[in-house]
From Swiss-Prot:
The gene is lepA. Residues 8-189 form the tr-type G domain. It is found in: Cell inner membrane. It catalyses: GTP + H2O = GDP + phosphate + H(+). This is Elongation factor 4. It holds the Pfam family LepA_C. SUPFAM superfamilies: EF-G C-terminal domain-like, P-loop containing nucleoside triphosphate hydrolases, Translation proteins. GTP binds at residues 20-25, 136-139. It comes from Helicobacter pylori (strain ATCC 700392 / 26695).
Length: 602
């Protein structure tokens, strides 16, 4: 395999696309056309390495591959960085785009521009990337290339006169696209003679080599005999190995030079030692300052994860630690619940990230888990002028100690067919949304910009959005600020005891409605006991809704045939006393469905 090329013959590019617009299939075509993987080893979605990615048809972990291509008698190196398309994984997108000079903007010829595409394109434009529009799926009978071109120009403001029209599935236009990448996307810039400056834009854990860093060399070069300084930690490490990325196998090399992308092995045991966005430099001749403008991924949603078999707490800890080796955005800390025992409070990027992590824990580690209702971080101002950050409803201080509560807001961008506009605006109003902007992209599509409380979108917003627009709307958001809100803690009491795992922080105006729905749902789910069970929803000490599960009746008078009525009365009174005693000491086992029900109640 050819390995080295002058910097003028290197092209670093990424692929920006909304979920399901054919990005992974296009990546497969480019890999196949450049013969980076033999036909025998080639399979669909070769860049997607997790089973969950293939099953759901999504990209979660950004991958990279080095391609060699000959154009007009010259050898070129094309470094392709595949990126996720879902809003939860936008941190993967931003780090990948920082290491490129260009990006392919892939748009489905049947669907047009979607909200996530716009968000990622703006990240690329902020990083001064050359954008190359690519219209995919042109072979489909309902493809409308002219309308999509106009859509891209109107929505993003990119000239589409030289747009590439391709079909990744039918392999149409792939050769022309490769040539356009070479002629349009600029070569990397950098000083070969300057001290080493390398940006870590991804890291993961390898069972044999330890923590590996995927880097873009901005200045200078790195070789296997160098000692490296990780600028964020101030620690020095020897280089154990350098590799070029390939989805199936790493290709060893003795050096990585300015403009190149490669994998660095420093023999480290955790990805926390090589944080994404950190800078590698030469320990003996370091660069003056690290690469700027990189933010670590912050969790957006928090939920409790508890093992159903309580003796598997340590297994859950081990499993989370193993997943954290590959996922710097995942963080967790132990917590305990009266109802569920010992578990962990886990921070996620969003609901899809939470679903994927829970599914991987259950599938790869054989755990059975209960997840509590997802929540966000609230800023609680106390009467003594101190501030407390609360991510678990059970940690909320008593009402008389709180001066005010601020909740995080997001700016949401939603693109929808205009026929669903009324339904969508009603949903956004129900979710306490504030309209900022409404813009018609063309006669049939509208772009809405709303500010929304984060709390309202972490429950079931995405499902309801798809439901009220028949799946046609696309959605993207970015965090903006914390705003004061009228929030209260809604508790659920079963047989007089507060079930801490079911507590939620909610807008005061919605508390009664939610509490009513919650107790009615739980009445259906909790099995009848030998004693009467009261299910109550409360705010502070005030009960706002109640349902009662009647006791299972045993006919104690069945053996009394006729005779004195006092005999029957005596047996019934004895039963009544027994039930009263049982009610005082009896415990109610809550089924798992009760914890899942809270997620589905609007």
């Amino acid at each position: 395999m050819k390995t080295k090329a002058p910097m003028k013959n290197i092209r670093n590019f990424s692929i920006i696309a909304h979920i399901d617009h054919g990005k992974s299939t296009l990546a497969d075509c480019l890999i196949s056309e450049c013969n980076a993987i033999s036909n025998r080893e080639m399979k669909s979605q070769v860049m997607d390495t997790m089973d969950i990615e293939k099953e759901r048809g999504i990209t979660i972990k950004a991958q990279s591959v080095r391609l060699n291509y000959t154009f007009k008698g010259e050898d070129y190196v094309l470094n392709l960085i595949d990126t996720p398309g879902h809003v939860d994984f936008s941190y993967e997108v931003s780090r990948s785009l920082c290491s490129c000079e260009g990006a392919l903007l892939v748009v489905d010829a049947t669907q047009g521009v979607e909200a996530q595409t716009i968000a990622n394109t703006y990240i690329a434009l902020d990083n001064h990337l050359e954008i190359l529009p690519v219209i995919n799926k042109i072979d489909l009978p309902n493809a409308n290339v002219l309308e999509v071109k106009q859509d891209i120009e109107d929505t993003i403001g990119i000239d589409c006169s030289n747009t590439n029209e391709v079909s990744a599935k039918a392999r149409l236009g792939i050769k022309d696209l490769l040539e356009k990448i070479i002629t349009t996307i600029p070569a990397p810039s950098g000083d070969f003679n300057a001290p080493l400056k390398a940006l870590i834009y991804d890291s993961w854990f390898d069972n044999y080599l330890g923590a590996l860093a995927l880097v873009r060399i901005m200045d200078g070069s790195i070789n296997t005999e160098q000692e490296i300084l990780v600028m964020g930690t101030g620690k020095k490490h020897g280089v154990l190995g350098l590799y070029y990325p390939n989805p199936l196998k790493k290709i060893p090399t003795k050096s990585l030079e300015c403009g190149e992308i490669g994998i660095v092995s420093l023999g480290l045991k955790s990805v926390t030692d090589i944080a994404v966005g950190d800078t590698l430099t030469d320990a003996k001749n370091p660069t003056s300052k690290p690469i700027e403008g990189f933010m670590p991924a912050k969790p957006f949603v928090f939920a409790g994860l508890y093992p159903i078999e309580t003796d598997r707490f340590e297994d859950l800890r081990e499993a989370l630690l193993k997943l954290q080796l590959n996922d710097c955005a995942l963080n967790f800390e132990p917590e305990s619940s009266v109802a569920l025992g010992f578990g962990f409070r886990v921070g996620f990027l969003g609901l899809l990230h939470m679903e994927v992590i829970k599914e991987r824990l259950e599938r790869e580690f054989g755990l059975n888990l209960i997840a509590t209702a997802p929540t966000v971080v609230y800023e609680v101002h106390l009467t003594d002028n101190s501030i407390k950050y609360v991510q678990n409803p059970s940690e909320l201080p008593p009402e008389n100690c709180i001066a005010c509560i601020k909740e995080p807001f997001v700016r949401a961008t939603i693109i929808t067919p205009s026929e669903f506009l009324g339904n969508l605006m009603q949903l956004l109003n129900n979710k306490r949304g504030i309209q900022e902007k409404m813009e018609y992209l063309n006669q049939s599509r509208v772009m809405l910009t709303y500010s929304l409380p984060s709390n309202e979108i972490v429950m079931d917003f995405y499902d309801k959005l798809k439901s009220c627009t028949k799946g046609y709307a696309s959605f993207d958001y970015e965090p903006i600020e914390n705003r004061e809100a009228n929030l209260v803690k809604l508790d659920v009491r079963v047989a007089g005891d507060v079930v801490d795992a079911l507590s939620i922080i909610i807008d005061k105006n919605k508390a009664y409605e939610k509490g009513r729905a919650l107790v009615e749902t739980m009445k259906e789910l909790i099995p009848r006991q030998l004693f009467e069970v009261a299910i109550q929803a409360s705010v502070g000490n005030k009960i706002i809704a109640r349902e009662t599960i009647k006791s299972v009746g045993k006919n104690v008078t069945a053996k009394c045939y006729g005779g004195d009525i006092t005999r029957k009365r005596k047996l019934l009174e004895k039963q009544k006393e027994g039930k009263k005693r049982m009610k005082a000491i009896g415990k109610v086992e809550l089924p798992q469905e009760a914890f899942l029900a809270i997620l589905k109640i609007d």
